[in-house]
Every structure is written in structure tokens, then in C-alpha cells.
Amino acid sequence: MLLSDRDIKAELTAGRLGLEPFEQGMIQPSSVDVRLDRFFRLFDNHKYPFIDPAEDQPDLTRFVEVVADQPFILHPGEFVLGSTFELVSLPDDVAARLEGKSSLGRLGLLTHSTAGFIDPGFSGHVTLELSNVATLPIKLWPGMKIGQMCFFRLSSAAEKPYGSAEYSSRYQGQRGPTASRSFLNFHRTDVSGTEAGRSSS
């Protein structure tokens, strides 16, 4: 069930849902606007010949902090990691989804490339996957509205929410944009037994 503005306010008041720092004016009819922090991670294209999700590549990105009153310039075709200004904390029975702002999308800014879903139990600053698909550079101002977060109540509380000992929960408690940690639980299925155009069953 998608939470309404009334539901979101009730969850915040009860302390079950956390958004820090929070401003009342950020609440929309069924979402909450989130803002851009001043921290970014830029890809260094000269450190590795290719990106391999199975390998630890610690120098793939470099950390950049911009002055709070100055913009970060995102060039056409560029992809960087950013993060929400807000620290987001979810209870065990609420999941969230980050969506871009329509007005920014019409300028060619993509807020997240794929990872918009946030598991129940998560706590941290949400990493943004920012892309410029326009033909001109885009100024990204720290503190600007960068996306909107909607919340979904689960039919029951998660048995093992994000952050549980059973899961690696690689991004729990993250501060600022966090580089990929896909190598920590990389999984690859053996597909050698299948033939093209035929089902394995």
C-alpha cells in the first residue's frame, strides 16, 4: 500500500520513519521531496581497462566535495554518484522507492539509473546515480530538490530486514555517495548446460 501524505506524517511523528533533516514543506500528496548533498563520486576512466563487477576496483571512482554555495557541473553523457542530503531510516514493515523529479527529467537529468528501491530496515544516505542525457551541461546545486521518495507498507514486517546479520547489507549506514560493492556477493550461475533457443527444462 502506497502511503499518503497523512500516513507519512503519522509515521514521522511516531518516529518509525526517519528523514533527517526534515522540513514539513517537503511532503507531497504521496511522497517526500529529497535534496542533493554536496558530495559526489566521479569515475576515473584511466585506472582500469574495463569495469568488472566481480572484482574489487577501489580506484574506479574518486571522492569530490563541492563548496555548499557552488554548483557541481554534470556534463552531457557523464555519469556520477551523488547522495541525498537526508538520512533515511525505514522500519521493518515499510519499503521505499526513489523517483526523479519531472521538472528535472525534462531538462535531461536522470536521478537514478536502476537502483530506486530501498529495502525495509535500511538506514543511511541514499546514493544517487546521476546521468546527463541532455546536450548541454547541467548545474547541480547542493541542497536543491533532486528526487522524491514514496513509501510502501508491507503486508507484514520483513522477517529479515535490511541490516540483519543474515545479509551482508553492504550499504547500511552509508554516508555520502558509496561506490559499488558488487564484488562482495558476486554470483554467477553456470549456464554452459543450456543451448541457444532451447529451454533447459
UniProtKB/Swiss-Prot annotation:
Pathway: Pyrimidine metabolism; dUMP biosynthesis; dUMP from dCTP: step 1/1. The keyword Metal-binding does not apply. The record marks G116, F117 as: Important for bifunctional activity. The keyword Hydrolase applies. It catalyses: dCTP + 2 H2O = dUMP + NH4(+) + diphosphate. It is an enzyme of class 3 (hydrolase). One of its GO terms (biological process) is dUTP biosynthetic process. The active site is at E129 (proton donor/acceptor). InterPro entries: dCTP_deaminase, dUTPase-like_sf, dUTPase_trimeric. DCTP binds at K101, S102, S103, L104, G105, R106, D119, T127, L128, E129, Q148, Y162, Q174. Bifunctional enzyme that catalyzes both the deamination of dCTP to dUTP and the hydrolysis of dUTP to dUMP without releasing the toxic dUTP intermediate. Belongs to the dCTP deaminase family. Homotrimer. This is dCTP deaminase, dUMP-forming. It comes from Leifsonia xyli subsp. xyli (strain CTCB07). The gene is dcd.
